[in-house]
A protein has these predicted regions:
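Short beta-strand-plus-loop segments that form exposed binding edges in beta-rich domains
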Residues: 148-158, 489, 513-524
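Extracellular glycan-recognition surfaces and repeat-rich motifs
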Residues: 1-11, 340-384
Length: 548
């Protein structure tokens, strides 16, 4: 997850400025049965009042103080105590915040924890202070996953602090923990049903079915518990996937609508005479009618179909000005318009009303093992210490031969470890440009970061490597880029170019992307600036460098 996790300097731990995260430990080899978990800790909506929870306190319908941090054990979870649950009469450890924002007699003029030092002292003064508790159930696998988590936060400086976890075994025949876990899942499923977030009828039906089955349970046994929790978890997972997909589609169609109705650089005005523009416009109207009219989609497949149709229409619009008929082997046509967002940036309007380039991953699909992938402020794509695949289908590509060119590199570990491996001719090549189309599969390894070592820096973040790593070099300094900002400047200079040819058969849709198949500690890849060239079809236009 995200957020700043710290346990230094005091005997308590915290996660600050996070939105969706878990901190947990898994204990194995435990006997089956119920367990009681206690922990001292609290949830603060925002240590800096970013979401105005001070102003919302005590107000009817207040959502700013809804607790979004939880103590959990396996399937059971319990909202954490609010930071206001244990007000102090004095400024403990000179690390508290005085309550001046409410007339509530239980809080006004008192002090609340505002850091780890005050939390530690208050926890240690009395073991009942900020004491959270829940019961849970350990099944026949003997595993207990215990911890704290946060989800659903959309503002800054949300804060959870915690310490002193204790676990008590309640016995094999005690089903209290199982009932608590089942109740928690039913509560979560009901909350998802009641949510006003856009979703599908398919997901709601699944949640209702799981809730009804769990609510009809009589005597709870280990077997019944396992069956019901599996059904509820599956329904909740699918419900969340449906909500996420519906929200993503709504965001996508809203962004298209804004640019379709706008004018100037940040709009689609220059494509208004293309067939794709009209198709995209009509489709946005259709989707908005669905959202505003029915207020719900039928199935997840319907959402995915709408998303693909949007992508196809958008790609058709972007490539609407390309004259593919003039292409031949000697004079290929620039077909970069077939790639949605080839340079990971989009035109947008800033707070001053200025049109600027903003980092964007629109158009690209990502499959990531650890979540260490994304577009950075420098408007390049970065994969750090992760295995990922970043790709997109190239809709509307006519049959024929193509060449794709991009800039990108791979560093096999931290810069020193990678440098040693390079010197010893042992550096791995775990990142590659790829195109898949029909039965064809074209791959080109990304250049090593050491294929462009310079005596001068591109950016202040570039690092100097020891001369011993370059025994055959006469250069005075050996700099390589070490941050996306430096990578972007190197790419602008033409460094780290990588390319491959590929062929598209009639009616086929090629998939273009970059993937990192292996993962080394601190290994790193950056890439950007995709360009696409079309050579036409037929043997006469087969490029000399093409390989089947």
């Amino acid at each position: 997850g995200d957020g700043d996790f710290k346990n230094d300097g005091t005997r308590v731990s915290e996660v600050w400025n996070g939105r969706n995260w878990e901190v947990y430990q898994e204990i194995s080899g435990l006997p089956q049965g119920s367990y009681k978990i206690t922990m001292q800790g609290f949830y603060s909506p925002s240590s800096g009042n970013d979401n105005a929870w001070h102003e919302g306190w005590g107000q009817e319908g207040d959502e700013t103080n809804k607790i979004l941090g939880y103590l959990f054990g396996n399937d059971a979870s319990e909202p954490l105590l609010h930071v206001t649950a244990c007000p102090q009469e004095e400024n403990v450890a000179e690390n508290c915040e005085e309550v001046t924002w409410t007339d509530d007699a239980s809080l006004a003029g008192k002090w609340l924890c505002h850091g780890k030092n005050s939390a530690q002292e208050i926890f240690e003064q009395n073991s009942e202070n900020y004491l959270n508790a829940t019961t849970c159930y350990v099944g026949e696998d003997g595993k207990l996953r215990i911890g704290v988590k946060m989800s659903g936060v959309s503002w800054g400086q949300a804060w959870v602090i915690f310490d002193n976890f204790q676990v008590e075994y309640l016995g094999a025949d005690n089903m209290e923990g199982a009932q608590t876990a089942l109740d928690a899942l039913v509560r979560e499923a009901n909350g998802m049903l009641a949510s006003e977030v856009l979703t599908t009828q398919e997901a709601k039906d699944g949640l209702n079915k799981a809730i009804e089955a769990a609510s009809a349970v009589g005597e709870l046994t280990p077997e019944v518990y396992k069956e019901q929790t599996e059904a509820l978890n599956a329904a909740i997972k699918f419900g969340q996937e449906s909500m996420d997909a519906a929200t993503a589609l709504e965001d996508k169609v809203t962004a298209h609508d804004k640019k379709l109705s706008g004018t100037g650089e940040a709009s689609y005005e220059e494509y208004s005479n293309t067939e794709g523009y009209d198709e995209l416009y009509d489709l946005t109207i259709e989707i908005f009618d669905k959202i505003d009219g029915e207020g719900i989609f039928t199935t997840l497949d319907e959402i995915n179909d709408y998303s693909v149709r949007l992508d196809k229409a958008y790609s058709k619009m972007l490539s609407g000005h390309i004259d593919f008929t003039t292409a031949n082997k000697d004079e290929p046509v620039d077909a970069t318009g077939l790639i949605v967002n080839p340079s990971f940036q989009t035109k947008t309007e800033n707070d001053k009303g200025e049109i600027v380039d903003a980092a964007s991953a629109d158009g690209w699909l990502v499959e990531s093992l650890k979540g260490g992938s994304g577009v950075k402020d420098a408007k390049v794509y970065e994969i750090f210490s992760d295995s990922s695949e970043v790709y997109q289908p190239l809709y509307n590509a006519p049959a024929g031969y193509y060449r794709v060119v991009m800039n990108g590199f791979y560093r096999a570990g931290g810069f020193i470890d990678a440098g040693v491996a390079r010197r010893d001719s042992a550096d791995a090549q775990n990142a590659e440009l790829f195109v898949k189309c029909g039965d064809g599969n074209w791959i080109e390894k990304l250049p090593s970061i050491f294929e462009h070592v310079s005596e001068l820096k591109y950016d202040g973040s570039d690092v100097a490597l020891p001369d011993s790593l370059f025994p055959k070099s006469n250069e005075l300094y050996h700099f390589i880029v070490d941050q996306p900002a430096g990578a972007a400047l190197a790419f602008e200079d033409g460094a780290y170019e990588c390319d491959t040819y590929f062929y598209v058969g009639e009616g086929e849709v090629p998939v273009l992307g970059v993937r990192k198949t292996g993962m080394l500690t601190n290994d790193w890849s950056c890439f950007d600036n995709f360009r696409l060239y079309y050579y036409g079809d037929g043997d006469a236009n087969r490029p000399d460098g093409f390989v089947d």
